[in-house]
Amino acid sequence: VIQALQDLDWQGNGKTVSVRINSIDTHYMYRDVIEVVEQAGEHLDTILLPKAGTASDVYMLSALLNQIETSTGLKKHIGIEILIETTLGMANVMDIAKSGREERLEAMHFGVADYAASCRARTTVIGGLNPDYPGDQWHADLSQMLVACRAYGLRAIDGPFGDFKDPESYTLAAKRAAALGYEGKWAIHPSHCLLYTSDAAD
């Protein structure tokens, strides 16, 4: 990851460069942040924190970034984006948005796969519709996260769609998120990139 950040021009055409680290409940998290930011911080725009559950998770990452930037003399201010992908995170989403805005927080992403597991929900496709549920089973959660983002000036990003062989359903999922007010959706397969860029213009 560090070598890729150093060697390739990821920031061309105004792209935001973000690195997903391990979650705070692992012993890898702090080394992820220290190594990536100390060695390639000038090429980085944000850190993506998975499984954010409380406002203190964002504060911890922000405090670590403060220390690294001060210690290394890094002039670039690195932002924070988070994944809401647990029931704890969704229960605290408004508080996280409110306090996180003062701690570098710029965006929230809906991590539907782990969120479904956290809810013990029955799903057929990651990010897709369930034929046993009338409508979109994630509508309430997406709306709740969106309100928190809009109330406190954060970007709202929808998460992945798992069936690479169903481009139509990916496109429909992206359009549903856009209709709610989401600013983007994950593209986790090359085919998604082409679909997303063409549909984003619509």
Feature map (PLM): residue ranges:
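Expand to "…catalyze enediolate/carbanion chemistry for C-C bond making/breaking, isomerization
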Residues: V1-S198
